[in-house]
Amino acid sequence: MSSGRCNVLMKARISAGWEERDAAVMVGRALFGVCLLVVMILRPTIAASQEAQSRDQSANAGEDFFKPPSNLFQMMTYYKTAPGSGSTKGSITNVTTETLNLRYDHALDLAPMWILALRSDLPLLAKNPISSGNPDGDYLHGVGDADVQAAVIHNLSQRWAVGFGARLIAPTGGDTLGSGKWQIMPIIGARYALWELNSSSYIEPIIRYDVSFAGDPTKKNISNLQFAPTFNLGLPDRWFISFYPSADIRINLGDPITGQTGRLFLPFDVRIGRRVSDNAALSFELGVPIIKDYPVYNLKTQVRLNVTY
């Protein structure tokens, strides 16, 4: 057998192995999310009085941006596939990013009806991009782009709240696991409580503008509008379901990314979860594209554990 034929067979076997591994990872994550939901469903419900049930219904374990708890620790696993550059010039392949994000929030009362909400994120990534330094698309591991955020929230009434702030994103992930750019993200939003339904239901539209301002000049400039027209519905027994809880609706105003044919990304995004105790909530989120002219992702899943104290 010639050496050329051996090399071809070896590459085919390696490629098949990677495809099998990626399929196993996707199945494993899906099973993990299903198992978490089953655990929440089967978890015994502690009997309580009507007064306690009413209090629990309005409790917040960190899922409501405009009602931040004093302290929050969040652990989130994030699985995403998106178009990336292939091994040959002009070709496109799927790039998988797996993230374990560690978040800490702290809220301060500035004055009656005024709150300062602080946030920091540390993403730990595993990603398989194809590049000159990683031509085989092996998984690379490390820290992604960390960020800090500050927002001022003003509660106008029990029904209305408004807020504004900004997030600073540092290029700690370097050129491979991050954007290579410093970014600033102004944020503005409002909250309207749906007391007609229950105390845990609300509409919460948020708008963000992500723009790069420094960093690696060879990297693509970032400039995109992000929308989250969140509708949260409180359900019995501490369950909740949110439509568009993440700012995944995007309009790209910056440099085009791999696979882009237009400026709009419109997904279907839903999160379902349960407050498993007065100070903890567990949720699962799924995002799939409807319009993918600006391909932010092909598939997104997130599992969050929020613990407040």
Tell me the role of every PLM-derived stretch.
Residues 50-215, 221-309:
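Transmembrane beta-barrel domains of Gram-negative outer membranes and organellar outer membranes
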Residues 1-58:
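Cleavable N-terminal export/targeting peptides
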